Amino acid sequence: MRKLSLLWLLLLACNSFAQTREIALTIDDLPLVASKMDTPGNQQRATERFNKIIEALTQNHVPATGFVIAGAIAKGQWVFLEQFRNAGFELGNHTYSHYNLNQMNADKYIADVARADKILSPLMTEPKYFRYPYLAEGNKVSKPKVLNYLTENHYVIAPVTIDSKDFRFNEQLYKVPYRSREAYINKLKTRYLEYIWSQTLKAEQRAKDQPVKQILLIHANLLNSYVLGDIIQMYKQHGYTFITLTEALKNPAPALTVPASENTIEKGTDENTSGGGTDDVLGIGGQLLFH
């Protein structure tokens, strides 16, 4: 944290940075990551978690753009999306199946986007936003073909400049027994917020002190139902103003993408996850929830 504080002081010394701290909040994988509506208990939990996200946004007067996986809308969750839009927030297309364009051909991917478009058209706001799952834009063959389709169908690509990697922390929270999560969240929250802030400082470094606007990626998940308000307050305490995605795209910071050579997939389940490997943030093993 000391290194982060020193870097922050150096950035503050630059007049251009001190005067232009603006950020747009974007939320992927709506309606709600790894949620079920198959029992009254699951319905209640999903509703409470989603409502917490809405409340954090509305109580802090923060604009947001959400990206919907159309194939992940469980029975009874359409109302979540209506609630999000009716609260004044934007909704965009995040495909039907959450495919990784770095791993498939353009035609199948385009069909998946079109399928989502048909389902989401009653809810999507203007301008029509699209975000690539996994931030994967494809290779030299698939990328231009998909981009041409999106352009012809009046989509605006929503880039990311700060990736919270929250799915890694969310996976850790799912490993904690349900009744113990409230007590555990404060410990996890500290690490999570520190990580987001380190990602923010890296983004500001990439911007090279230019007066650009940042775009933060988080997910509609269990973790952020607890912590979104803290994320918002952290940015406000550091002097950031929250703006719309439309405003951010007028002069965005350098965007993050996943090269076509990288094929990492994060998978999701409901209350339990398992698997192997090492998490570079938490130092734990396990599968990762949707990115």
List each language-model region with its residue ranges:
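Sec-dependent N-terminal signal peptides
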Residues: 4-13
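Sec/Tat signal peptide C-region and signal peptidase I cleavage site
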Residues: 14-18
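Active-site beta->alpha N-cap acidic-glycine motif
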Residues: 19-134, 234, 250
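C-terminal domain-boundary segment and adjacent tail
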Residues: 58-60, 159, 220-291
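Acidic carboxylate-rich catalytic motifs and surrounding loops in phosphoryl-/glycosyl-chemistry enzymes
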Residues: 68-70, 161-162, 246-247
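Catalytic domains of cell-wall/extracellular-matrix polysaccharide-remodeling enzymes
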Residues: 74-76, 83, 100-241
